[in-house]
């Protein structure tokens, strides 16, 4: 196991990270520490820098300035420990389900792929084609494809946004249960504030390239949907999202 990994999760440290596209400043000297194994949700208005942050962590973009670290190691040096899921499952239609899970792997990987499919409840669909699966099942395959690599960091970019309400709740429960079992670090970008407070240990609001709210969600698990405390936290985040202007220092709340 890489020395930057604590427990099974990757600890993250961002020091004064900025990302510019020409004159457009998307992230502006952002500082962030995420302990190993924490589940963090990131919310905010469109264009605020949420997905850019995930792309930096995934190695799909490089920062204009600042450091992105896994503990004391540059995250780019252990990028194989990071996996990312998108709203689109991105399955190859000409490959079977199990071959999509094992995509890019060499050697004896099929047993591990079957175990990953079993973990997401699709062990009986291994030989089928992606076209035979529902949207939720395709996302389960994408999750299995991430799990087979035993990631230290799982990045989720609106992976449930296109699913119906019931399937979305089922996927939320599945992701949380696998996180509790394996202990990897999770960053979830979502526009759904109720999803953020239901799933995460911590909710970050990114606005104007900085962290405008850093909210601890200390509600015991399993969490009961519709609970008063969840509703209160959701209202607090929504109120902050709707505020105009920008605070120089992040507002920290401990629920």
Curated annotation (Swiss-Prot):
Reactions this protein catalyses: ATP + H2O + aliphatic sulfonate-[sulfonate-binding protein]Side 1 = ADP + phosphate + aliphatic sulfonateSide 2 + [sulfonate-binding protein]Side 1
Compartments, record wording: Cell inner membrane
Superkingdom in the source lineage: Bacteria
Membrane topology: Peripheral membrane protein
Record's GO cellular component terms: plasma membrane
Disulfide links within the chain: none
Protein name: Aliphatic sulfonates import ATP-binding protein SsuB
Organism expressing this protein natively: Escherichia coli O6:H1 (strain CFT073 / ATCC 700928 / UPEC)
